[in-house]
Amino acid sequence: MQNLVILGATGSIGKSTLDVIKRNPERYRAFALVAATSVERMRDLCIEHRPRYAHMVDESAAKRLADALPTGLGIEVSSGDEALLGLVTAAEVDTVMAAIVGAAGLLPTLAAVRAGKRVLLANKEALVMSGELFMEETKKSGAQLLPVDSEHNAIFQCLPEQVQREIGHCDLSAAGISHILLTGSGGPFLTSPLDTLATMTPAQACKHPNWSMGPKISVDSATMMNKGLEFIEARWLFNTARDELKVVIHPQSVIHSMVQYRDGSVLAQMGNPDMRTPIAHAMAYPQRISAGVEPLDFFKVGHLSFCEPDYSRFPCLKLAMDACHQGQEATTVLNAANEVAVAAFLDGRIGFTDIAVINGECLGKIAKTHLDSLDAILALDWEARRLANQLISRV
């Protein structure tokens, strides 16, 4: 029986993880559920899954949750950073699902890595903000890192076993690999006229054609910043050289990514667009378990199409790829600026196309600095957020 801590339990990844646990009760137990402020959803999850611990990032939310839970469940409710870090590093914990969206997930995820846990990584920002430090800590502690993002999980499945065992420090060329092909649907605005993008609303941006996701990642998919962040994440997970990683638009989201080998072979991982598949794979690796996902019906798929990304339509993707090549400072700044800009767009304070403008200006204005510690990373993150908010106030 594996004990899991689920960071981001009330989000889409968290709920899908709990569904997989429920389908495999003889193998997994939700040891602790972690959320930010969603008291009602957390209460319902606690009643259904009976974790030993429920942690709310917000202290007042923790108090409301404690009052809302029926007596007799025996669930300990906590809040605060110290309690959270204690949960992810607890001796009873085998696996940590890192699914808190954004920079907020970095500290507990890094703590789980340092404690040598099996970490299922759905929080791409951890690598975008601190890729070099994160991978060094993974190697030092011996933690097992398994990607949950559908694309990175697909790539992982298409790699030789030896490369899988050396994630973060692998040599793709030595394994006969020429390219990793990172696929993306292009989001809801793939074919929208360019002159209409400035007036797109949050509701329109959140209507992804294939995936069911939260608001932040839905907007990132509409700008293709999500693919840009995944590009950066893939660089760290698979130790890619500059010319070993490419982005391919694939509107149907049936092929989740591909690996191209030197002999001309291309291995692709395919399946219906349901996050329970990569979650179940990461949870059970190297075995396989039921995920509750319908098998792919090739007769219904009909056809698959591919095209190159249009950077005039998706400037955020180009910003992210360029930042990846510039280094850790640029990706840390970009991630922070984008989180602030997307929040402002969802609040109706800026337009859709302003997101890329804010991101680009932040990248151009913050002075370069050497990020040699977590404190330095967090300081740069704070400075980028301050600048982004300043720029937004002038829009």
From Swiss-Prot:
Residue spans crossing the bilayer: none
Broad enzyme group: oxidoreductase
Amino acids binding NADPH: 10-13, 36, 123, 125, 214
Entry-linked InterPro entries: DXP_reductoisomerase, DXP_reductoisomerase_C, DXP_reductoisomerase_N, DXPR_C, DXPR_C_sf, NAD(P)-bd_dom_sf
The EC number(s) this enzyme carries: 1.1.1.267
GO MF terms, alphabetically ordered: 1-deoxy-D-xylulose-5-phosphate reductoisomerase activity; manganese ion binding; NADPH binding
Cofactor(s) named in the record: Mg(2+); Mn(2+)
Residues that, per the record, bind Mn(2+): 149, 151, 230
Example of a GO biological process term: isopentenyl diphosphate biosynthetic process, methylerythritol 4-phosphate pathway involved in terpenoid biosynthetic process
Binding, 1-deoxy-D-xylulose 5-phosphate: 124, 150-151, 185, 208, 221, 226-227, 230
Catalyzed reactions: 2-C-methyl-D-erythritol 4-phosphate + NADP(+) = 1-deoxy-D-xylulose 5-phosphate + NADPH + H(+)
Pathway it works in: Isoprenoid biosynthesis; isopentenyl diphosphate biosynthesis via DXP pathway; isopentenyl diphosphate from 1-deoxy-D-xylulose 5-phosphate: step 1/6
Keywords on record: Isoprene biosynthesis, Manganese, Metal-binding, NADP, Oxidoreductase
Alphabetical list of Pfam families matching this protein: DXP_redisom_C, DXP_reductoisom, DXPR_C
Function of the molecule: Catalyzes the NADPH-dependent rearrangement and reduction of 1-deoxy-D-xylulose-5-phosphate (DXP) to 2-C-methyl-D-erythritol 4-phosphate (MEP).
Family from the record: Belongs to the DXR family.
Name the record gives this protein: 1-deoxy-D-xylulose 5-phosphate reductoisomerase
Species annotation: Shewanella amazonensis (strain ATCC BAA-1098 / SB2B)
Higher taxonomy: Bacteria, Pseudomonadati, Pseudomonadota, Gammaproteobacteria, Alteromonadales
